[in-house]
Amino acid sequence: MFAEFDRTNFPIVKVTMNSSPESLEDFQDFLNKWTELYEEQNDFSFIFDTQSVTNPPLKYSIKMSQFIKNLRKRDYQYLQKSIILINSNKVQWMLDFIFLIQPPVAPVYIYNINNNDLIEGNILLNNNIQKIIDHPHTSYIEPNKPFLPLF
């Protein structure tokens, strides 16, 4: 599986992306695990570690946008915020594309881990989460309605 969900520090859920999805089923499994968190009806936050993602296929960006659209229809958003750790321009472009089509349902903070030492040895330190959110190089994407109602 390309994404591993670590709930050890719930309500913070760390999702480590080990690669790009190998198949549609692999990607659907990722979406199913996300949906399961919603079905538990507890607030949570994501930390996505995308350091191992090298060449994300465009087709999954479209599917992710459709998934966000479906999440938006829910009465309550259990996802409170997401922090996305990146080290690749390709991943940044993919995220820009996804959120252009379908803005997030909760605040998103995108942090390039190449900026400084808030990540030690590829491990996010719990006391650095707020520092990442507040960091001047962190990009903030506001939850919103879609700019283009394409999907």
Question: Which residues does each predicted region cover?
Answer:
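Amphipathic, Lys/Arg-enriched alpha-helical "gate/interface" segment within cytosolic domains
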Residues: 2-151
